[in-house]
Structures are given as C-alpha cells and as structure tokens.
Amino acid sequence: MLRIGSHVSMSGKHMLLAASQEAVSYGANTFMIYTGAPQNTRRKKIEDLNIEAGRAHMQENGIDEIIVHAPYIINIGNTTNPSTFELGVDFLRSEIERTAAIGAKQIVLHPGAHVGAGAEAGIKKIIEGLNEVIDPNQNVQIALETMAGKGSECGRSFEELAQIIEGVTHNEQLSVCFDTCHTHDAGYNIVEDFDGVLNEFDKIIGIDRIKVLHINDSKNVKGARKDRHENIGFGEIGFDALQYVVHHEQLKDIPKILETPYVGEDKKNKKPPYRFEIEMLKEKQFDDTLLEKILQQ
C-alpha cells in the first residue's frame, strides 16, 4: 500500500486532531509532526495534545502510521559545549516519551553537527548521546536522517550513518529516514541510478533499516551540500526520479513524507502544495501547471 503524506502542523487547542484533519484534507494516509516549535523547547503537557480525539480521527480516515520529527535544536554531536549536548540528550528523551504517547513508532533525528571538531569527534559524541538516551525497552525507534552535509553536519554519507549505528549498544532501536533532497545534495546519483544508490545503502547499512522516506526535490545540483528543498518536479531531481522512489517495490510500505516548500511570493499568504503533489505522485503523471494550481486554491 502506498503510504504518502506530508509535514503538517500540530498546534492550537486541537493539536493531534488538527494535524490529522490537515493531513486528510491533502488526501494523505500518513503524516509527520513536530510536537511543538522545532526551534525551541516549549512543549505542551502530554495530556494537552488531544491524543484521543486525534487517534479517533486517524482511525476513521485510515491513518495508522505517523511520524514525529525531533526539533532542530537537539545537537548531540556538539563536542565543544557540554550544556548543548546535555540539553540534546534530555530533550530527546522527553520527545521520545511524547512520541510514544502519541502512538508513533518513529522519531526522525538529524544526527548532529560537530561544530568544527571534525566528523570523527562528532560521530563519537553522537554515539555517546544515543547510548545515554536509548532505553532498550522503548517502543519508539530513532530514525537517523540522511543529511546533505551542509556546514558541519554528520551523517552525510551512508558510511557515517553506519558508523553511528555500529557504535550504539542497543542499535535495534535505530532506523534510518532516507531524504531524497539530502542524499542528492550529498552527492548520490538518485536521478540516474536510484537502484545503485539503494544497493549501496543495503550493503553499508541494510535496506531494512529504512523506516521513513522524506520525498523532496532539490534546488541544487548533485553534491552541492546545501539542503534546499524544492517542489516535486521543479528541482534538480525531477518528477520521474521522485515518482520512481515513491513507487519503488522495495520501499512500498514505508511512509513517504513531503517537506516541500509552500508556494507564493506573498510571505503571509503562501499556499501548501501537498494535496496537489500527493495526487500527482499517486497518478504518476507530472503536471507542469502545478504551481499555478496551488496558488489558485
């Protein structure tokens, strides 16, 4: 079954219910949320997330699997500032609790940035952090995201992710979130040889680790190490390559999440592209008038 959705907002008083309603309005059967603003630690209590009503709405609409994304402020790769590392460890622990309470099985995490100490030192610190965070009995896997390699990001190569996974004691609690834009920007040829890239991933990490896919086009050429998402079919990856990933036999049951940009020049009135992009990917047919249609909604 094709599981496809997008990032949606969990906010206001309806919280999880609002997120599910937004996803359904896009024709989605899965979705991804942050449990609060990704750039700060302010969070509502678990009992204020409106979980029961949200889960009921999900069930009514055939949504059985959702994803949580950890906030960007978590950086367990930071070797220079102990307080940043400790905040990351503590906050990731509490986010895992919230993820479990919501009923999600995967929390996507940017592995971390070494902030100048070098990739080896950063990876060592990430392993230390994950070993501190992980409870072997937790019901949530941490999905390490494939990164573009912007700045001092760790996890831009499959080898770096494998190194992290191998260093973690209870690595059965680790999975991978494969991001098409990041992988392309890191230098992998997913446009012309996605099967080759997937085979390489399988040899180095194991395809069974992939539990989430982020489906994004890229504003940049392969290997640019920039990480700037583009709407589906309007970037350097292109529609054909992305729809090949979405419908790939080896990835068919994995949730595919769009994180493409809102459309429009007016910053206060940008339009979400997800209903249109999801439909286009389901139909396997590129629509070059898509951006105009998004603006007219």
From Swiss-Prot:
It catalyses: Endonucleolytic cleavage to 5'-phosphooligonucleotide end-products. PROSITE patterns: AP_NUCLEASE_F2_1, AP_NUCLEASE_F2_2, AP_NUCLEASE_F2_3, AP_NUCLEASE_F2_4. Pfam families: AP_endonuc_2 (PF01261). Keywords: DNA damage, DNA repair, Endonuclease, Hydrolase, Metal-binding, Nuclease, Zinc. Binds 3 Zn(2+) ions. Zn(2+) 2 binds at residues 145, 179, 214, 259. Its EC number is 3.1.21.2. CDD domains: AP2Ec. The keyword Protein transport does not apply. It is an enzyme of class 3 (hydrolase). Endonuclease IV plays a role in DNA repair. It cleaves phosphodiester bonds at apurinic or apyrimidinic (AP) sites, generating a 3'-hydroxyl group and a 5'-terminal sugar phosphate. Belongs to the AP endonuclease 2 family. NCBIfam families: nfo, PRK01060.1-1. This is Probable endonuclease 4. It comes from Bacillus subtilis (strain 168).
